[in-house]
Amino acid sequence: MTTALDQLKQYTTVVADTGDFQQLAQYKPQDATTNPSLILKAVQKDAYKPILEKTVRDHRDESADFIIDRLLIAFGTEILKLIPGRVSTEVDARLSFDTPRSIDKGRELIKLYEDAGIGRERILIKLASTWEGIRAAEVLQKEGIKCNMTLLFSLVQAAASAEAGAQLISPFVGRIYDWYKKQAGADWDEAKNGGANDPGVQSVRRIYTYYKTFGYNTEVMGASFRTTSQITELAGCDLLTISPDLLQKLQDSNDTVERKLSPDALHDKPTERVAIDEASFRFQLNDEAMATEKLAEGIRVFAADAVKLEKLIDSLR
């Protein structure tokens, strides 16, 4: 029998969402994604402590920020040895509202990769999908630095990212699901709100349909999954980035996976493009409580994990 994972790969580019690169080979993903939380989690494992310790030792007198950049590149370099495609490396979330510094950081990360002998075509620079992050992506893309817009929870963020020429977006599924489930409390009905009716799945489907309707080349990569059902409901999406735990569940399953998304079979096609000047962007984002709250929370969590990583580095000096 063909596994669910192998069936999914017939329709979608499968990406591994992890800093634990030793798990990559068994799932044979095309690309990989990392974020500050995943790197923090990885360096606390015995298998990866030597990478952290060596990076600190080699740059002991430099700032924690300087060392973190080298640590990100060290992980990215190891990941790229194990996959044929691209790795996503994230700009510090504390720069989410600072366009000039986000641009500078993106350039710095690319230079570090190129100094390590890795071409920029194999790197995606992850930026938060704030107005400022999207403007940074617009500049970087024109310089040939490909960007992955993360912490994306709404159509207006997706529309603005596409207009800016971003290479790829990462609309979050699980965190949207979490928000609606928490809001409903005891009234949540999993049977009614799961599967194709999952609010996170519906959000990605809407974004995918918008992009294909208006001919945007920006890739759609569903992210932040809680269940294999959320993944299989998006079979056919350009890419899906999946944690090792869920990759394993898909590999262990022989359930049939059918294509759910296709540019040739779009439903509920939009008739108008979203207005995305700065004022319209901010108003539409503000008008969507879920997107506003999850974007803010995501930035806080990633920023807090960056601080934890800095403290861990300082403790090793």
From Swiss-Prot:
It is found in: Cytoplasm. Keywords: Cytoplasm, Pentose shunt, Schiff base, Transferase. The keyword Glycoprotein does not apply. GO terms for cellular component: cytoplasm. Its EC number is 2.2.1.2. One of its GO terms (biological process) is pentose-phosphate shunt. It is an enzyme of class 2 (transferase). Signal peptide: none annotated. CDD domains: Transaldolase_TalAB. Pathway: Carbohydrate degradation; pentose phosphate pathway; D-glyceraldehyde 3-phosphate and beta-D-fructose 6-phosphate from D-ribose 5-phosphate and D-xylulose 5-phosphate (non-oxidative stage): step 2/3. Its main location: cytoplasm. This is Transaldolase. It comes from Burkholderia ambifaria (strain ATCC BAA-244 / DSM 16087 / CCUG 44356 / LMG 19182 / AMMD) (Burkholderia cepacia (strain AMMD)). The gene is tal.
